[in-house]
C-alpha cells in the first residue's frame, strides 16, 4: 500500500523535512500495522536530522520514536492486540534471542535500535512494527498523551529505579525541568517520597516545574547552581542528580552532589564533552551512572501509573505532522515545556 509521510533525504535544518507518498509493505508474520494518530518529538529527532558520524540512515528516512495510534492489520502470526485497539509503541527494537534480551535487559542488546533513529520512525500515517512493541492503552489516554509517554517514561523509570534507586527522604536534583524526561523524573521521585530540586533557565518553566511537584527550582539564568543546591540541602549536597544536559552543568554537578551520591546521565543536549576532576569522584566516592532508554518490562511496569493518572504526560502543544518544520524550530529554540506532539490527520 501507499501512505503519506514526512521524510528527509539528507541531513540539515528543519527545511530538509518533506511530505512524501511512500510504499509500505504488508506487515510481516509477527508485525502489526498501526494507523498513526500522534507522534511525539524528542531531541533525538533534532540530532538525527542534523546528522553526525553515528547516524547511518537509509533514505528516505522517517524520524519519530514516540508513537500512538490504532491497530489496522495483523501479520499472520502476530498476537497480543486486535484490529481497532488503541495502542502506544515501545520504541526500542532488539534481537530477542541474546543473553541481554532473554534476561530482560533488551536495551543492552548489541543489535538494539530505536524507531526514528536507526530504524524507520513514526512521521507517517501508517507503520509496521513488531507485535511485542505494541501496548494497548484503551481510552484512558488521548493519542497525544499516549504518544508523549513511551521514551520519556522508559528513560525516567530506568534512571530513577534501576540506576539511582531513589529512596524516600532523599534529595534529588533534576536538570532541565522543561524536558519530557525531566517532567517524568520529577513525578516519579515525588511518588517515591523524595525531595526534588529542579533547574531551568526560564521563570515560566520554573512555575510549571513546581506545578508538577518540584519542591524548589533553581533559575540557572539568575542563581548560582551549586550554591542553591548547597542551601537547599544544608550544605550536604544532593543524594542524586539527574542530568541530560552535559557540558558545564554536568561538571558543576560533581561539586553539588553529596559524598557517596550518584549522578545519572542519559544524554547531553548542550554539550557531549565535560571536564571531570577525578578527585571529586574517587575521594568523595561519587557514582556516575550512564543510562539509555529502559527495557520493555519497564514500560509495562510503569503502565498502571500512566493509565490511572499518577504519572501525567506534559504536552506543551499539538502541531500537525505536515508542519513538522515549525515544530522542530520550536523544540530547537527551547520554547516548550514537556512534549511537542505531531498529530496525523
Predicted regions and their residues:
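Rossmann-fold dehydrogenase core element
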Residues: 259-266, 275-315
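Mid-domain Rossmann-like dinucleotide-binding core that forms the NAD(H)/NADP(H) cofactor-binding site
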Residues: 141-223
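Cysteine-cluster motifs in flexible loop/terminal segments that predominantly coordinate metals
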Residues: 93-126, 130-131
Amino acid at each position: 500500500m501507499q501512505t503519506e509521510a514526512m521524510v528527509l533525504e539528507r541531513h540539515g535544518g528543519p527545511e530538509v523535512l518533506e511530505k512524501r507518498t511512500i510504499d509500505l509493505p504488508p506487515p510481516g508474520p509477527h508485525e502489526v500495522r498501526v494507523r498513526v494518530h500522534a507522534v511525539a518529538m524528542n531531541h533525538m529527532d533534532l540530532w538525527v536530522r542534523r546528522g553526525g558520524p553515528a547516524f547511518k540512515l537509509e533514505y528516505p528516512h522517517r524520524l519519530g520514536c514516540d508513537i500512538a495510534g490504532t491497530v489496522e492489520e495483523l501479520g499472520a502470526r502476530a498476537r497480543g492486540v486486535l484490529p481497532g485497539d488503541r495502542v502506544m509503541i515501545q520504541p526500542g527494537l532488539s534481537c530477542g534471542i541474546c543473553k541481554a534480551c532473554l534476561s530482560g535487559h533488551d536495551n543492552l542488546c548489541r543489535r538494539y535500535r530505536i524507531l526514528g533513529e536507526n530504524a524507520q520512525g513514526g512521521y507517517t500515517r501508517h507503520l509496521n512494527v513488531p507485535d511485542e512493541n505494541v501496548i494497548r492503552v484503551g481510552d484512558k489516554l488521548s493519542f497525544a498523551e499516549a504518544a508523549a509517554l513511551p521514551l520519556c517514561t522508559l528513560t525516567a523509570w530506568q534512571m530513577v529505579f534501576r540506576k539511582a534507586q531513589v529512596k524516600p527522604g532523599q534529595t534529588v536534583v533534576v536538570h532541565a525541568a522543561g524536558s519530557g524526561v525531566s517532567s517524568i523524573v520529577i513525578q516519579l521521585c515525588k511518588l517515591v517520597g523524595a525531595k526534588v530540586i529542579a533547574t531551568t533557565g526560564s521563570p515560566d518553566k520554573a512555575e510549571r516545574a513546581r506545578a508538577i511537584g518540584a519542591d524548589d527550582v533553581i533559575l540557572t539564568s539568575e542563581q548560582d547552581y551549586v550554591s542553591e543546591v548547597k542551601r537547599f540541602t544544608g550544605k550536604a549536597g544532593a543524594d542524586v542528580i539527574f542530568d541530560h544536559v552535559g557540558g558545564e552543568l554536568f561538571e558543576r554537578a560533581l561539586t553539588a552532589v553529596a559524598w557517596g551520591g550518584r549522578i545519572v546521565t542519559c544524554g547531553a543536549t548542550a554539550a557531549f564533552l565535560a571536564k571531570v576532576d577525578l578527585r571529586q569522584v574517587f575521594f568523595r566516592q561519587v557514582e556516575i551512572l550512564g543510562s539509555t532508554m529502559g527495557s520493555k518490562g519497564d514500560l509495562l511496569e510503569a503502565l498502571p501509573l500512566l493509565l490511572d493518572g499518577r504519572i501525567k504526560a506534559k504536552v506543551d502543544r499539538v502541531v500537525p505532522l505536515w508542519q513538522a518544520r515549525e515544530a522542530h524550530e520550536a523544540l530547537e529554540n527551547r520554547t516548550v515545556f514537556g512534549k511537542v506532539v505531531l498529530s496525523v490527520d
